[in-house]
C-alpha cells in the first residue's frame, strides 16, 4: 500500500512571500500498520539577499510589518518600578550570600547608582554585623576617584540599603580574562591608579586586606575603582605593637607575613597583594598557584615567583621587589612611586575634597552647579555663635589662628574682601609652585609633582580655602587639608595667615555687631 506525503519544494519568491509550493511524493508504509500522519517539513531559510530580491517580497514584508505595528499598543503598560526613597530600582547587578546589588536611578536627576540591599536577619544570623559596620565606616572616610564612593546608607526593619557609585565596566578580573593579559602600557596605567587608591586609603588609616582583581572594578573610561572593604582594617584594629593580627584575604593574593600569624603591617601586606595583581595583569597567570592549599602557602612563604623574561627589565625589577617575602626589604609605596618603570606617563590622581560630597542625606540627592569664584564668590555668612562653634574652645584668641585636633583645618580672621583674599591666596601659592582650581566658592590649592612628597609617601598636598563672612568688613578664612604633607601644609598656612590675617584680638572686638552678639552669648550663662 502506498501513501502520499507532502514534501515542500521551494523557490526564492515563494519562500520570501511565505507561500510554499507542494508536490505529491509516494512513500511506503508497512503492512497492517496504522496510517501515518503526513510530516510537513519547513522550507529552508532563504538567504538574506533573497528577502528583498523581488518587488513582491518587499511589498509583502512591509505590509506585515505595518500590520504588526498597528496591533502593537502605542504606549505599553509597564509595571511600576519599586522605589527606595527617591531611587527607582532596576535590574539586579549581582547576588551574594547576604543580599543583592541592584541598579537604581535617582528619580529627580536620572543619575545611576548601585544599591546594595542586605538582609538584616541573615547578617545577624551569620554574625557579620561588625563586618558590615566596618565597611560602611570605611567607605564614609574614602573620597577618591579610584575608590567606589558610598553616597548614602538607610535601613528598614528588614533591610539595609547602601547607595554606592555605579561602575559599569565590570571587574578587572573579567577584563584580564577577556584579553588573556594586558599590555605593559595598559597594565602600568591601571597599576598607577591602584597605587594611588591604596596610598590614599593608607593615609586615612584604612588597610583593605582583600585586594584582588575581583574587588577592583573598571568604569566605562577604563579607570579602576577599588571596592569591597568588608575585610578592611581601621587604626583601632591594631594592637599595642602597631600591627594587625587577623588572618584574612584570598589565598592566592595573601602576603607571607599574614600566613605566619605573628602580626603584620597592613600597608605592606596590601602592597604584596597589589604586586600579585600587577603580575596577573601583565602575564595572565598567578605567580603562586596550586590546588593544594598547603602547597600554595609554601610557595607564597618561599616567594619564588617565576617572572617571565619577555617582560621589560623595568617590569621584571618592580615585580621582583614588590613580591619580596620579607616585608622589611619589600618595596613600599614611596619606593614604588620612585621606580623608573612606575613613573612613566604617571599623573597622580587628586582625591576629592572632604566637602565635595553629593550632599545626600535622608534619601535626597542635591545637585549643585559650579560657580566661578572670580565672578561670583559664594561666601557664607556667620555670626558670633557660629564662629564660636567653629572653634574647639571659647577662647577668642583661637579665632585668629586656630588648628583643630586632626591638623586638617587652620582658620584665621582677615579684613580683606573675599575677592581680594582669593586673589592674594592664589598669587601666593602660585609663586610657591602650586596649582589652583576654583570651584563652588572655594579655592583648591594643589601640589603636583611626580616625586614622592615625603619619606612616608603621603602623596601630593591638597588644600581647600573657603571664606566665611562675619560682617561686611570681617571674614574668617578656613584652610582645610585633604591630603599631603602636614609640615608643608602648616608652613603654607602660617605664611598666608601672617600676610592676610588680623594679628590683634582687639581689632575683632572693635566690631559693634560682634561685641553685641558676644555680650548676649555671655549673658545667657
From Swiss-Prot:
Region ranges (Activation loop): 228-257
Protein kinase domain span: 87-342
Cited InterPro entries: Kinase-like_dom_sf (IPR011009), NAF/FISL_domain (IPR018451), NAF_dom (IPR004041), Prot_kinase_dom (IPR000719), Protein_kinase_ATP_BS (IPR017441), Ser/Thr_kinase_AS (IPR008271)
GO molecular function, one term: protein serine kinase activity
One Pfam family linked to the record: Pkinase
CC cofactor: Mn(2+)
Coiled coil: none
GO biological process: signal transduction
Record-listed ATP binding positions: 93-101, 116
NAF domain: residues covered: 372-401
Residue segments, region PPI: 407-436
Catalytically driven reaction(s): L-seryl-[protein] + ATP = O-phospho-L-seryl-[protein] + ADP + H(+); L-threonyl-[protein] + ATP = O-phospho-L-threonyl-[protein] + ADP + H(+)
Description of what induces expression: By drought and salt stresses.
Known role: CIPK serine-threonine protein kinases interact with CBL proteins. Binding of a CBL protein to the regulatory NAF domain of CIPK protein lead to the activation of the kinase in a calcium-dependent manner.
Written domain comment of the UniProt record: The activation loop within the kinase domain is the target of phosphorylation/activation by upstream protein kinases. The PPI motif mediates the interaction with the ABI (abscisic acid-insensitive) phosphatases.
Name of this chain's protein: CBL-interacting protein kinase 21
Organism, scientific name: Oryza sativa subsp. japonica
Source taxonomy: Eukaryota, Viridiplantae, Streptophyta, Embryophyta, Tracheophyta
Amino acid at each position: 500500500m502506498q501513501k502520499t506525503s507532502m514534501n515542500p519544494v521551494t523557490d526564492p519568491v515563494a519562500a520570501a512571500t511565505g507561500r510554499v509550493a507542494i508536490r505529491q511524493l509516494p512513500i511506503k508504509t508497512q503492512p497492517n500498520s496504522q496510517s501515518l500522519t503526513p510530516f510537513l517539513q519547513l522550507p529552508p531559510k532563504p538567504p538574506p539577499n533573497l528577502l528583498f530580491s523581488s518587488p513582491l517580497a518587499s511589498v509583502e514584508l512591509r505590509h506585515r510589518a505595518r500590520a504588526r505595528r498597528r496591533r502593537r499598543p502605542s504606549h505599553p503598560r509597564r509595571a511600576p518600578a519599586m522605589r527606595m526613597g527617591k531611587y527607582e530600582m532596576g535590574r539586579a547587578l549581582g547576588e551574594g550570600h547576604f543580599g543583592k546589588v541592584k541598579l537604581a536611578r535617582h528619580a529627580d536627576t536620572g543619575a545611576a547608582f548601585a544599591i546594595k540591599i542586605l538582609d538584616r536577619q541573615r547578617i545577624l544570623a551569620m554574625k557579620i554585623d561588625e563586618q558590615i559596620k566596618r565597611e560602611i565606616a570605611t567607605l564614609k572616610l574614602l573620597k577618591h576617584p579610584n575608590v567606589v564612593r558610598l553616597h548614602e546608607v538607610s535601613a528598614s526593619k528588614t533591610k539595609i540599603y547602601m547607595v554606592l557609585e555605579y561602575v559599569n565596566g565590570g571587574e578587572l578580573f573579567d577584563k584580564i580574562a577577556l584579553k588573556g593579559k594586558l599590555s605593559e602600557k595598559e597594565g602600568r596605567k591601571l597599576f598607577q591608579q591602584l597605587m594611588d587608591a591604596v596610598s590614599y586609603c593608607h593615609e586615612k588609616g584604612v588597610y583593605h586586606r582583600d585586594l584582588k582583581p575581583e574587588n577592583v572594578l573598571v568604569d566605562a573610561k577604563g579607570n579602576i575603582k577599588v571596592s569591597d572593604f568588608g575585610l578592611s582594617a581601621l587604626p583601632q584594629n591594631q594592637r599595642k605593637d602597631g600591627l594587625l593580627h587577623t588572618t584574612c584575604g584570598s589565598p592566592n593574593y595573601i602576603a607571607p607575613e599574614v600566613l605566619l600569624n605573628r602580626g603584620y603591617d597592613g600597608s605592606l601586606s596590601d602592597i604584596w597583594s597589589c604586586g600579585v595583581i600587577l603580575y596577573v595583569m601583565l602575564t595572565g597567570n598567578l605567580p603562586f598557584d596550586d590546588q593544594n592549599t598547603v602547597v600554595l602557602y609554601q610557595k607564597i612563604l618561599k616567594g619564588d615567583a617565576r617572572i617571565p623574561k619577555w617582560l621589560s627589565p623595568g617590569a621584571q625589577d618592580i615585580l621582583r621587589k614588590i613580591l619580596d617575602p620579607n616585608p622589611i626589604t619589600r618595596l613600599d609605596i614611596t619606593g614604588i612611586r620612585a621606580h623608573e618603570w612606575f613613573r612613566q606617563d604617571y599623573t597622580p590622581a587628586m582625591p576629592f575634597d572632604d566637602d565635595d560630597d553629593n550632599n545626600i542625606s535622608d534619601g535626597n540627592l542635591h545637585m549643585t552647579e559650579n560657580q566661578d569664584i572670580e565672578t561670583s564668590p559664594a561666601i557664607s555668612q556667620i555670626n558670633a555663635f557660629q564662629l564660636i562653634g567653629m572653634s574647639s574652645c571659647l577662647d577668642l584668641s583661637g579665632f585668629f589662628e586656630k588648628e583643630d585636633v586632626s591638623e586638617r583645618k587652620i582658620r584665621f580672621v582677615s579684613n580683606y574682601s573675599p575677592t581680594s583674599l582669593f586673589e592674594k591666596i592664589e598669587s601666593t601659592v602660585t609663586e610657591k609652585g602650586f596649582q589652583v582650581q576654583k570651584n563652588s566658592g572655594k579655592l583648591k590649592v594643589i601640589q603636583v609633582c611626580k616625586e614622592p612628597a615625603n619619606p612616608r609617601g603621603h602623596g601630593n598636598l591638597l588644600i581647600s580655602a573657603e571664606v566665611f563672612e562675619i560682617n561686611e568688613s570681617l571674614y574668617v578664612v578656613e584652610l582645610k587639608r585633604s591630603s599631603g604633607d602636614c609640615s608643608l601644609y602648616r608652613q603654607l598656612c602660617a605664611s598666608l595667615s601672617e600676610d592676610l590675617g588680623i594679628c590683634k584680638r582687639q581689632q575683632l572686638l572693635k566690631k559693634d555687631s560682634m561685641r553685641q552678639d558676644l555680650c548676649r552669648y555671655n549673658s545667657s550663662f
